[in-house]
Amino acid sequence: MKKTLLFALALIAVGCAESTPPLNVVLIVIDDLGWIDTGVYGSSFYETPHIDQLAARGARFSQFYTASAVCSPTRASLMTGKHPARLDITNWIGGEQNGLLQQATYERQLPLEETTIGEAFRDNGYATGYVGKWHLGREGFMPELQGFDFTATVNHAGQPGSYFSPYGNENSPRTAVPDLEGDSAGSYLTDRLTDVSLDFIERNRDQPFFLTLSHYSVHTPLQAPEETVARYDRKAAALGPETEEHYESERDASTKLRQDHATYAAMIESTDESVGRIVEKIRELGIEEHTAVVFVSDNGGLSTLMRRSFNQATANMPLRAGKGWLYEGGIRAPLIVAAPGAPAGLDIAQPTTSNDLYPTLLELAGLTQMPEQHLDGESLASAIFGQGGTAERPLYWHFPHYHGSGNRPSGAIRWGDLKLIEWFEDGGFELYDLSADLGERRDLVGERPEDAARLLSELQRWRGEVGANMPTPR
């Protein structure tokens, strides 16, 4: 079976005939898109026909996990194939929260010593491009120094000042997103990032390319074209007014339970249109037979906040909590891979993580694996080609920080169907069987103490292995 897969990949990536060029890769990263925020993953409120069609063409991962519940750490794992705790990038860069513990220190940039996935493709003769959100360091650590020959609308900011041109906010370095050449007043950022990406694909149509389109959407501020918002306003009105019953408490925070935010829905629609335009350009250029498209989010949807504002972006039900938390709502996310030659319409249920994309994309492209670099990732190529997945393995999370969502310093491990969450303030922990309790409502610590002890021991062993920084008493 392995030989069959290798032969298929060789046909695609290297070519057994002159007419088979190397595989192009388009990696589309969405910011804060929740697990159930698209039609193919179960939403009935958001409309995502192009994303749904992409999944129908390829593989949909139903148990994909982001490496962190916040953006910068997950993005670091995508670029390196390493766990954020190993890189010591465990918080969103710039994040600071006060609490009972002194939060752990963390790195504020992606080290240049890492061989990024951009460098891996560039060093194999690919044209490389990075468009959109970076959030992995300031000047001196930007993507043009990390393997990407072409970049656009990239800086250290985690969100724009506005999604309508001009995008930057000179009064806040966190939202200082540069404008694009050719912008007109009111240009919508999601559309413009797509325009630039299409130009990159067009320019490099006759050579192998690796493009990362990293949308700022659907991160706050929640803004979208008025006519699209109006349509979803009507759709939300049909659901009836939002009330206290559509929220539940999560410790000191509040979690939204119903998808009904019209502006957020309009932002998702714009992102879906971006995916459709990318796929159509690839088809128009006649390169679809040697171009893979990967669609992924960097963490769960923003459903949980400290303040009860009735303005959370989305709901992740049946998952618990959202962005910032190590419950499923914060770390389970969509992943779709459409690769030429792979079976269409696959639903892959094996637990996987952001760290896996680096070796996966190398193998799909027929490039040499770099196991000393992607230490914490395993290739999913066999699963994508319908030939079995990786062996069962534990997945780990480490978040030694406080977050505006209400989460506190914590760690987690999933091993098989069992998942344990450890709270660093008081040393408490919770155990859930995800096969029977996806919403993490029934804590099994009292019923299965041996399993809890086994998972806790493995989580603590792993933290020692990767040198994870811990919070300290004040």
Enumerate the predicted regions with their spans:
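Active-site-proximal cap/lid insertion segments
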Residues: 23, 30-46, 92-94, 141, ...
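Structural recognition of the beta-strand scaffold that forms the well-ordered cores
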Residues: 26-29, 60-66, 71-72, 77-80, ...
